[in-house]
Amino acid sequence: MSELDLEENNPLLPPSQINDENYEGSIFGEDARFCPNSRQVFRICSNLKLLIDKIIPICFKEDEITSSNSAILSDPVIDLVYQAAGGKGDGKEGTSSYKYRGSLVFCLLKVCDWYWQQAEFELSDNELYSLRALTAQTIAAIIIEREKRDKYLFLNMLCHRYTICVNGVDATPVSALEMAVDMHSTIVIGSSGYQRCIKWLWRGWIIQSSTDPHSYVLYKGAASQSFRTHFDPARIKTPLYQNILEIFLSIIYLIIFTIVVNTHSTLTGDIDFFETVLYLFTVGYILDEFIKFYHVGWNYLGFWNAFNDTMYCILTVAVCFRIASVNSHGATRIKYDEISFRVLACASPLMWSRLLLFLDAYKFVGAMIVVLKTMMKESILFFFLLFVVIVGFLQGFIGLDSSDGKNEATQRILISLVKAVIGGSSFEDMGNLVPPYASVLYYFYQFMLTVILMNILIALYSTAYAAIVENATDEYFALVAHKTLRYIRAPDQNLYVPPFNLIELLITPIGWFVSTSTWKNINYYVMLVIYSPLLAYITSDELSNARRIQYNRFKGVPDDANEIDTEWDLTDGYDEDSPGDGDDCWDRIRERNSEITEELRIQREGERQDPEFMINTHQFSEKIDKIVKPVGQASKVGVNWQIYEVIEKIDKLTNLLEVVVAENKELKKRLENKA
């Protein structure tokens, strides 16, 4: 059967009227049958662990492992890593090694996890096992950087979900992409190949297979000029467009919240339109949190989930009091109404800060969020120590207060201890309580709080900030990767972004009584209506990108090439908005080629105006090669490039010495024969 013509201007047909296999011919990927099984994955991991155990017998400096010219992770070592995957051949498509090497990144991350477990259980060798874990991550990054086949790297190595047999039980399938994020392996996440894969996932050029939940596939429609191909509700699943939609809905949510909080009348009336919309938004977001947690599990929980859940709890309390006020009368109604709006007002800081959740894909905001999250985690230790100290002193003060058989100052004591944390307390607060015992005890409390605990907090914050700033770029990459996977891990086949998930909830009972094809059609048209404004933007954006992608494929370069027109390369760049002389894409491609040719011709003419200006570029390149440091050659033999030339000269002298020794032996034999 012929492949669906994506360039055809098809009508907006529902999924049931389109051949699924042909239409999903717009995607193509790797079949799971051509990937190693769980037992084979375990053997590959064991081989890699044996290799790393041998090459890291003692503790080296981390720089000797992570540096780009590492003498430890030399080319022969990386060749052994490939051999550890098994199979025959050199990794080319069609060989068995091609099949097994696709799991190398996953296996290396799994080995890294094993080393982390060993470091935790065997504290005496903690540093050695941590270094081996670092080595496994570094090798994984090297494997990613060395792979030049985009499809193989993205689909087989990073996105495919592999499973490993541990103690006779197959573990839950997970991809190297997801494992790196869950392990927070910034070394792997920061590699260029990994980031390109994340970029393709973010743009929807890589999507999950509709037939195999463990595989991802390339979206062929990225280069299509068909309006129908891009004006499809399924494209809402793209993380980029989900993020845009969520930002837009969050701004609306914030505007409605502001209207409700700041226009509240003293007269307690019924729930108005804006309150109704606010409450529906809130219910939709809470429902979405429950569904995602149910499907994804504990991996879904994070800093922002705790932040949002706290805000939703406050809003839920406000809604409950508001509903109670409507159903009450007299003074009770007024009281509940006041409580409702006062609680609602307390959610304002969280509501505004929530916008950062959707803006963290931008580097400035993202780096700031990473620092904030790290500092909040470091604060846990401080607050634990603070809690223990406060409880201890609280018990002491209460004991002093009750020494006369009466308990009269418990509330004042507790308030004073808490106020001391924020600097709002004084020594006079305890001056009248069982002198001089309470005063002496309070001096100790103030000393411990201000001199010891506060300095611990400052040190923790300083360490956290320094660690993040030093590795800010990779930490930002990790944040974006986590955000992208958060969208991709969403379980919905039909994506209804809150509060539109309430519509899905209302129409779900219909699916119990109609056929599967009819249910698909209903969801298709519902999403087509509610998302039509965004789909218009998506279509415009993707049609613009499609022209550049077609140009890249014509030139034989990756789809994401020529996105930036650099000043030093006259042949790169592509103006997506240029209409060309004709409507056909080939007219635009020919026009761009003509522009490049003309620019190169003008450049050469300008260079040749002075005959003495030109140099022999071939000879110039050879001279450059002669003075370049032998980094590549040193890596091949596993030595530091700084001593490579010395070692090379020693090797030459050794060879000459061996020749002299051999000639002397031959001469000695001849003399003995003559004698």
Swiss-Prot record:
GO cellular component terms listed in the entry, alphabetical order: fungal-type vacuole membrane; plasma membrane; vacuole-mitochondrion membrane contact site
Keyword Coiled coil attributed: yes
A biological process from GO: calcium ion import across plasma membrane
InterPro entries the UniProt entry points to: LHD_YVC1 (IPR056337), TRP_calcium_channel (IPR052971), YVC1_C (IPR056336)
Membrane topology: Multi-pass membrane protein
Location(s) in or outside the cell: Vacuole membrane
Transmembrane segments: 244-264, 271-291, 301-321, 355-375, 380-400, 440-460, 495-515, 518-538
Chief site of localization: membrane
The protein's role, per its UniProt record: Vacuolar calcium channel involved in the release of calcium ions from the vacuole in response to hyperosmotic or alkaline stress. Required for activation of CAP1-related transcription of oxidative stress response (OSR) genes, but also for maintaining the stability of both the mitochondria and the vacuole in a potassium- and calcium-dependent manner. Contributes to pathogenicity. Plays a key role in hyphal polarized growth and re-orientation to host-signals through its contribution to the localization of the Spitzenkoerper to the hyphal tips.
Family under the similarity heading: Belongs to the transient receptor (TC 1.A.4) family.
Protein name, per record: Calcium channel YVC1
